[in-house]
């Protein structure tokens, strides 16, 4: 007999789980269909393992770059990469257990299989043993997330994608990271700090080109300072596997670099092409992203989408979580106007040092408001944690303000601890804070964050 539900999520990642748990809390009969592991990209091959690696890299930096000036004579006999991986995976395992416990507590059925639409209300679940079953629902959420893109160049298969990084059992001696986005920058920083000879290849003049120019300039400076070899205007032509197992990346302009591991981090694409979406009539764009309105509705009644798969969305875990929860509030808790505001979403890049930002860059503000209406405040200093050492690291910050009242429409920072500063400032900016509001706030000294409220 076909099982029927009030609400089904296709995809057991952060967005799907958040939305289903919220709906279940209102007494709805809910299910999740997930072909792999609960938690999706974030928990298994994204935010969580990456952040563990980031912390590992911070420990390495503390020992190698900063400990001597603080009086610690530290001798590291060896770095056990396998132990780091073991600890990381054990932590992920505990998250899986937590997810399963919460879903069970909320009486959510979990189908460990692959979902394909049969019609707008019916889903076929396929299992590893070849068996199938049908389930139906009044409401269906598509939250399948994305997957890494691989370039169409000869020998691309010799490289690994960003997911594959977390399957490595040993630290590469030499590594090439191809990509200019936050994933590429984060992976390059981690691997470099852990001890790999690291090369970062970008198509244009710098990585993270969509960030504020102050951030980009500082990042490029720090990459060089930390020993990451940045290759600009780098267009891959071919990857050659050599007799000793090493890989040579050949660029279109003739440059060549030989490494042990090559990582493709050139972007992600939506995983919407494998769920038989076409039978539903749900509209997508040319990239396969699902077109939704501000309420996460598709063009088909009863079918919704959140997360990395939607057109014009922001590919961040907390965005998917927030959108999923608000969707369930609207559908099942009598809040007909509940939806996520995608403006002023704070973001962090876990580079070395980290980057934090919310709102418009200076060029974006000038384009939107006119140069005569934009005023910028900046601060540049050496992070105190590093200032007492020989490995001094810059910390740079910017406020972008508009109008006579100097409303803050953008806040940007790169430096030690910025990743933990940005959340609180995002609340203030979301509430419409002005430069005067920041000026009227007493600074906490000595901290990096005080610079945001003392700029002149």
Regions found by a protein language model. Give the residues of each.
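Short hydrophobic core segments
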Residues: 8-10, 115, 134-145, 177-178, ...
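A Rossmann-like FAD-binding core segment of flavoenzymes
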Residues: 109, 116-128, 135, 194-294, ...
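Beta1/beta-strand and adjacent pyrophosphate-binding region of the FAD-binding site
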Residues: 2-13, 171-181
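Flexible, glycine-rich terminal cap/loop adjacent to redox cofactors
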Residues: 8-15, 19-36, 41, 48, ...
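A conserved FAD-binding loop/helix module that cradles the flavin
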Residues: 306-366, 437, 445-456
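Glycine-rich flavin
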Residues: 2-5, 21-28, 33-171, 204-208, ...
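FAD-site-proximal beta/loop scaffold in flavoenzymes
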Residues: 157-173, 256-334
């Amino acid at each position: 007999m076909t099982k029927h539900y009030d609400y089904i999520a296709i995809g057991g990642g952060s967005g799907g789980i958040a939305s289903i748990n919220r709906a279940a809390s209102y007494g709805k009969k809910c299910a999740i269909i997930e072909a792999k592991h609960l938690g999706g990209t974030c928990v298994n091959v994204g935010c969580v393992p990456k952040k563990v690696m980031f912390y590992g890299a911070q420990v390495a930096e503390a020992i190698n770059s900063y400990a001597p000036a603080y009086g610690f004579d530290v001798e590291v006999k060896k770095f056990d990469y396998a132990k780091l991986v073991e600890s990381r995976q054990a932590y992920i395992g505990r998250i899986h257990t937590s997810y399963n416990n919460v879903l069970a507590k909320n009486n959510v059925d979990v189908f460990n299989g692959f979902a394909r639409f049969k019609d707008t209300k019916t889903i076929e679940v396929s299992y590893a043993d070849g068996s199938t079953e049908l389930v139906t629902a009044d409401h269906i959420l598509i939250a399948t997330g994305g997957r890494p893109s691989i370039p169409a160049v000869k020998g691309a298969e010799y490289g690994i994608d960003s997911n594959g990084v977390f399957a490595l059992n040993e630290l590469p001696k030499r590594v090439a990271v191809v990509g200019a986005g936050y994933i590429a920058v984060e992976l390059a920083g981690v691997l470099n700090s852990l001890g790999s000879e690291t090369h970062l290849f970008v198509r244009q003049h710098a990585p993270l080109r969509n960030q504020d120019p102050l951030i980009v300039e500082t990042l490029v400076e720090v990459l060089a300072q930390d020993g990451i070899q940045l290759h600009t205007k780098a267009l891959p032509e071919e990857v050659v596997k050599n007799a000793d197992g090493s890989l040579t990346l050949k660029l279109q302009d003739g440059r060549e670099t030989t490494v042990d591991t090559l990582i493709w981090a050139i972007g992600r694409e939506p995983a919407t092409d494998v769920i038989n979406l076409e039978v539903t009539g749900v509209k997508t764009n040319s990239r396969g992203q699902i077109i939704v309105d501000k309420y996460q509705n598709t063009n088909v009644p009863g079918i919704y989408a959140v997360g990395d798969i939607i057109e014009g969305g922001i590919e961040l875990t907390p965005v998917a979580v927030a959108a999923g929860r608000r969707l369930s509030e609207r559908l099942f808790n009598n809040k007909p106007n509940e939806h996520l505001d995608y403006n002023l979403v704070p973001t962090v890049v876990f580079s070395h040092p980290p980057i934090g930002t919310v709102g418009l860059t200076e060029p974006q503000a000038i384009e939107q408001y006119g140069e005569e209406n934009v005023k910028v405040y900046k601060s540049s200093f050496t992070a105190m944690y590093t200032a007492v050492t020989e490995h001094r690291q810059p910390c740079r910050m910017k406020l972008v303000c508009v109008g006579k009242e100097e409303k803050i429409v953008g806040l940007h920072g790169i430096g030690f601890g910025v990743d933990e500063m940005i959340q609180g400032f995002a609340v203030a900016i979301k509430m419409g804070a002005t430069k005067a509001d920041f000026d009227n706030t007493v600074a906490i000294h000595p901290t990096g964050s005080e610079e945001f409220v003392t700029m002149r």
